[in-house]
Swiss-Prot record:
GO terms for molecular function: orotidine-5'-phosphate decarboxylase activity. It is an enzyme of class 4 (lyase). The gene is pyrF. It comes from the Bacteria. This is Orotidine 5'-phosphate decarboxylase. The keyword Lyase applies. It comes from Thermobifida fusca (strain YX). GO terms for biological process: 'de novo' pyrimidine nucleobase biosynthetic process; 'de novo' UMP biosynthetic process.
Length: 233
C-alpha cells in the first residue's frame, strides 16, 4: 500500500512537477498541487501531474473570501475531481459550509493555523494565546460547518483528534524526516511522530522533491514508515 504522504509538488514549472509526480506516485498516496503552480498553469497542471495514475489529487488553494465567492471557486474546480480542496477555517462557518455544499464529492480540508506561524507571529495578527487554542477553536468550527478534513500542525494533531473524533481526515504539513532542514516551518515533527499523534496524511515537499532522486527519496521514506509500523502495509 502506498504511504500516507501527500508530496507537495512546489515546482518552478509544469514539466518539473510532472516529472516529480511520475517519480513519486508509485510510493505515495497523494499528489499536492499548490496555489503558485495552479495560478500559473490552471487546470492543465492537474491533468499533467495526474496522468493515468490512480494517485489522489490534493488541490491546496487555501480559499478565503466571502461565502459566495468561495462557493463559486469550489464549484469551478470540482470538475477536476480533487480528493481534497483546502479553505481557510478563519473564513468562518458560513464560508466553509458554502465550499462543502458547492463541492460535495470533494473533501473540503479546512486549514486551522499555518505551520509557518509561531506564537509571536500569531500575536502580531491579533491571535493571542497559544497556537493550539486557535487550532482547537477553528477545527471545531470547521467540522461543525461540514468540513471532512482538517489541516493542522503535527504538534496539535493529538489534541485535534481528541476534539473531532476518528472520522475527520487529519492532514499535517510541517513534517520533516529526522535530520532534514526545518525551512520556513515553525511547528514541525517527524513523520513517525505525526502519525502516532493521529495524522492520516503527511504533507512532505522539499525533503523528497529536492533530493537528488525524488522517487528514491519517496520510496525510502515509505519503506521507513512501514518498517517502523507507522504506515499501513
Amino acid at each position: 500500500m502506498a504511504a500516507p504522504i501527500a508530496v507537495a509538488l512546489d515546482a518552478p514549472d509544469v514539466e518539473t512537477a510532472s516529472r516529480w509526480a511520475a517519480a513519486v506516485a508509485p510510493h505515495v498516496s497523494t499528489l499536492k498541487v499548490g496555489l503558485e503552480l495552479y495560478l500559473r498553469y490552471g487546470p492543465a497542471v492537474v491533468e499533467a501531474v495526474r496522468g493515468a495514475r490512480e494517485t489522489a489529487l490534493f488541490l491546496d488553494l487555501k480559499l478565503h473570501d466571502i461565502p459566495a465567492t468561495v462557493a463559486g471557486a469550489a464549484r469551478s474546480v470540482a470538475g477536476l475531481a480533487p480528493a481534497f480542496l483546502t479553505v481557510h477555517a478563519a473564513g468562518g462557518a458560513d464560508m466553509v459550509r458554502a465550499a462543502v455544499e458547492a463541492a460535495p464529492e470533494t473533501r473540503i480540508a479546512a486549514v486551522t493555523v499555518l505551520t509557518s506561524l509561531d506564537e509571536a507571529a500569531l500575536g502580531a495578527v491579533g491571535m493571542r494565546g497559544p497556537a493550539r487554542d486557535a487550532v482547537r477553536r477553528l477545527a471545531v468550527l470547521a467540522v461543525e460547518a461540514g468540513a471532512r478534513a482538517l489541516v493542522c500542525s503535527p504538534q496539535e494533531a493529538a489534541m485535534v483528534r481528541a476534539e473531532v473524533g476518528p472520522d475527520v481526515t487529519l492532514i499535517t504539513p510541517g513534517v520533516r524526516p529526522a535530520g532534514a532542514a526545518q525551512g520556513d516551518q515553525a511547528r514541525v515533527a517527524t513523520p513517525e511522530a505525526a502519525l502516532a499523534a493521529g495524522a492520516d496524511l503527511l504533507v512532505i515537499g522539499r525533503p523528497i522533491t529536492r533530493a537528488p532522486d525524488p522517487g528514491a527519496a519517496a520510496a525510502a521514506l515509505a519503506a521507513e514508515l512501514q518498517k517502523t509500523g507507522a504506515s499501513p502495509s
